Amino acid sequence: MKKYFYLILPVCLFLEVENIYTQSKSLPINVNISLAPEEENLNVFQQWIRWNNPGSLLINHLIKQAFVYYDIRDGEIARLKSESDWRKRQENVKDKLMELIGPFPKKTALNPRITGVIKKEGFRVEKIIYESMPGFYVTGCLYVPDRIKGKVPAILNVIGHNQEAFRNQLYQVINYNLVKKGIIVFAIDPPGQGEHVQYYDPDIKFSSIGYSVIEHCYFGNQCFLSGSSCAKYFIWDGMRAIDYLLTRKEVDAERIGVTGFSGGGTVTSYIAAFDDRVKVSVPCSWATVSRRQLETKGGQDAETTFYRGVAKGITFEDLLEVRAPKPTLMTFVSRDEYLCLQGAREAYTEAKMAYDMFGQADNLEMVEDDSKHWMTPKIRLAIFSFFMKHFNISGDPAEEEAEMLSEEELKVTPTGQISTFLGGEMIFDVNRKETAKLIENLEKSRKDIEQHLNTVQIKAKEISGFVSPDGSAGKPFINGRYQREGYSVGKYAIRGEGDYAIPILLFVPNDNKEKHSALVYLHPMGKVTEAKPGGEIEKLVKEGYVVAATDVLGIGETKNTAARGITDGYSAVIIGRSVVGIQAGDIVRVVDYLKSLSDVDSLKIGAIGINEMCLPLIHAAAFDPSINNVVLIGSPISYRSIVMNRFYKNGLSIHEGGGFWHPYEVDFSWGVAGVLTAYDLPDLIGCVAPRSVVLAGLKDQMLEPASAELIDQELKFPHSAYSFKKAAENMKVVSSFESLGSLVDWSFK
């Protein structure tokens, strides 16, 4: 019986023989089977079903952690069985909200001024400037009905994310119809919009930072570094606007309302939760369940992000429930590009439980319409009807055709901007003053070097959200290897802190050495950036180093492709963590992996960080003494310099070729919220002592070479720490260098 064997060849194999099948049914002896030229693919997750969407690993990791807090909160809500239970929860939520956002500034003189009046049929528009804080000016227009008898209700209209603010035609329709129905309306410019642009550039007649949301995130990031939320200033401007309304003899203090659309809906929810004077609240296209928002559309901007909010058990729906049973109308559209309708429905259902328990279920309503992100005619009618109902105003709620005013007519300042008219302070200025107190405390702590270093070790782990490896990393997984001249490149993955893998390219010299010094190589553009033949990594390998080029979570293969760029950083903020802290944990895990290799000297493992990757690396090195030496190339010199200067850049956020409209994409993946309450990057450098550290080409807050003066100022403490540890010679600071290899060699000396 004959047996037939079939040779199955992959597509990359070619038979270099002529007419095999026509000349013979068997392979000739001299047949040459060879591989066709193959281009290297250095993606570790190539053809890997489980990790086939690595761009979602970071956000999913953060969502999973947030869900733990959401589940705890859901359990608390399920146990509320009486009006008394809900009242106790409301008090608890109020305390937490004040802890998260406050303390608010002291109330000072509003110093209101009227800069002009527009008279129209049936009403007038007064142009108002007031000071919510000394020298912090807010512009607005007050719509006042004619022929007022007694006192009338008043509504604060806070505005969503459009650049012209209340001058936008949609908001004019709202203001016009409310005032025609006998209600005073005060529409104000939020920070970063209208005439309250925070970074106005007269040369381009626009913000030098970008559109309103970009400004909000820009100064919001500075606030986060100082351990606060910029939401405080949006809320405070609104509360002080209500203070102004109550100075008007026409206003009924018992009939105060607030409404807003989109970002204005956000601030509406905030003000109504914090200010008990608000009787009626109408947040439009905002109120939703935090859980659903996070898993669908993701984080929106800095003012919607409460520092450690979710970790403290506070969610968006709490903002509705804390004011029960006061009248509240939610409006939403089904095809919203930014917000989740399912979440809004669930928020309504949960809040309805509270209103039911208070015996006033009718005080909470929700109206939906099928539309994109907008206030449709149906929704506008619902707004007018709801206010008229709860303010006891008779008449027809139907919408009238509004007479539009031009932006020029509604201009409050003669120059069109507060900054070019009165100057005054912006959010940056106020936050800088608050931060100066933190810096002063930090300098005092640094005087006791040993105690300060011990404190930094503890507080930096807590604030950054660093999680130490638990020793359960498991075995590495190999997904391919290439042989190059003199060394090999292996594609490996090791377990991260959660349900994700850390991709590594392992470069190993093909020599006869029993043990090698090893390096973790971190580049913000990913592990493949210098991985090609002739790149920096090859040079290091040919000097005898084992190199683990790594994509920590959120970088390279795992860079976020699943959501908006700001989502990762802000999702970490709400759970009390940071992308930097998570990445630092990844680095320590890679070091542990290197220590397990038989051809690596576990006492000679160093690390190289390029640009932004210096941030997680210096955290990791401060926390893990097994990182023997560190080379930082182009590191930002401090977080302090970012907060204490009006303008800053970070490499992960620069938008190439964006023009002035969006010159920045302001994510927060580089930041650690609350960092300046306890430490800064120079303190972490001090924690590395007495191990070797190289600081090459330090960058200032604009990513320009740091000046000698700035370097002296920021590195004063780490120099003191190295001297204290009798290792002054182990800290090297250079502005330029001939080769990376020379710096690495020095660090291993």
Predicted regions and their residues:
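Positively charged n-region of N-terminal signal peptides that target proteins for export
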Residues: 1-4, 601
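Bacterial N-terminal signal peptides
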Residues: 7-16
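Sec/Tat signal peptide C-region and signal peptidase I cleavage site
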Residues: 18-22
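Alpha/beta-hydrolase-fold serine-hydrolase catalytic core, especially in secreted/extracellular enzymes
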Residues: 23-137, 324-326, 331-503, 507-516, ...
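Cap/lid segment of the alpha/beta-hydrolase catalytic domain
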Residues: 149-247, 288-299, 305, 510-597, ...
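Alpha-helix capping and helix-loop boundary segments enriched in small/acidic/polar residues
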Residues: 162-170, 208-210, 225-233, 258-269, ...
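Primarily recognizes the serine-hydrolase "nucleophile elbow" in alpha/beta-hydrolase
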Residues: 181, 240-312, 590-678, 683-684
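Alpha/beta-hydrolase-fold catalytic nucleophile elbow
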Residues: 189, 259, 284-285, 331, ...
